A protein has these predicted regions:
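Conserved Rossmann-fold cofactor-binding substructure of NAD(P)-dependent oxidoreductases
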Residues: 1-21, 31
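Oxidoreductase cofactor-interface core, primarily capturing Rossmann-like NAD(P)-dependent enzymes
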Residues: 7-10, 30, 47, 58-177, ...
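Hydrophobic/aromatic beta-strand patches that form the interior of the parallel beta-sheet core
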Residues: 2, 23, 53, 91-93, ...
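Short, amphipathic alpha-helical "lid/cap" segments that border enzyme active or binding sites
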Residues: 13, 19, 132-140, 235-243
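A hydrophobic C-terminal alpha-helical subdomain
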Residues: 184-260
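NAD(P)-cofactor binding segment of oxidoreductase domains
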Residues: 17-53, 70-81
Length: 260
């Protein structure tokens, strides 16, 4: 165990000394995600660590421009930063949206109090998603595979909101209500209006940007997956994941996971 702050250069150097690969799982605001990762990457580069697994675990942000989805700007900046290192090579794991996050209040899709799925668009837009557990398993496999560098794309399932509702009905015997809130263009307009009022109020706009870029097709990962590289990992589908939770605890599955 190496104790120290994320900006403690001496502690970072002790931490990475002698390592072949470093897995970053930082989570914080944009300044932290950029500067703390840069400090860790610099320590890895000085120590000639072979690979650095960036704290990504999301949709394909490489298809976005800076500023499109502000919460993903740090990923783009770190991706570029790793192109300039002398020794350490970057690894970027993309998994779509976490399934547990999809069900949480953070996403604003599943509303347990009204037994409803609220969506934007036609409803035919697919959600690409992977569980936290499967993302961790793929990350461990990547860490053990010295040939794995660059972008690595994995997916548990790909379903639209109607198919997800069918999966819920099949699992729980309950048909959720489906409520369309507007077109994708409506969503884009609303999210930018809210963002423009107060960009610092991240919780006012984050879920809307999250929904938009998860389903508008711009940042999809399913066209070039790496699942087949690790055939021993059988990722859960939406149905599989639903089967591990009862309906009442579904919306808290992310918090329960993170607290355990």
């Amino acid at each position: 165990m190496i104790a120290g702050e994320a900006n403690d250069g001496a502690a970072l150097s002790r931490f990475v000394d002698g390592l072949d690969v470093v897995i970053c799982a930082y989570l914080g605001d944009n300044d932290f995600m950029i500067n703390a990762q840069k400090a860790l990457i610099d320590a890895c580069d000085r120590a000639h660590v072979a690979r650095y697994i960036a704290s990504d675990y999301c949709l394909d942000y490489t298809q976005l421009n800076l500023g499109d989805y502000p919460a993903k700007d740090p990923m783009k900046i770190i991706h570029s930063y790793l192109q300039e290192t002398k020794h350490v090579k970057g690894v970027h794991i993309l998994i779509g949206a976490f399934m547990e996050t999809f069900w949480s209040s953070h996403s604003q899709v599943w509303h347990a109090d009204s037994n409803s799925l609220k969506y934007w668009g036609t409803g035919e837009e697919p959600w690409e998603s992977t569980t936290y557990g499967d993302a961790a398993r793929f990350t461990a496999a990547i860490a053990l595979d010295s040939s794995a560098v660059g972008m690595q794309k994995f997916l548990g399932d790909r379903k639209n909101i109607f198919q997800i509702a069918q999966a819920m009905n099949k699992t729980y015997g309950v048909q959720p209500k489906l409520q369309c809130q507007g077109s994708l263009e409506d969503l884009r307009r609303v999210m930018h209006e809210i963002f423009a009022k107060d960009p610092s109020n991240i919780y006012a706009w984050l879920a809307l940007f999250y929904q938009y870029y998860c389903i508008n097709g711009q940042a999809e990962i399913s066209n070039d997956l790496d699942n087949q590289k690790y055939p021993d990992i059988k990722p859960q589908t939406f149905e599989d994941s639903l089967g591990t939770h009862d309906l009442q605890s579904l919306s808290s599955s992310m918090n329960n996971l993170l607290n355990n």
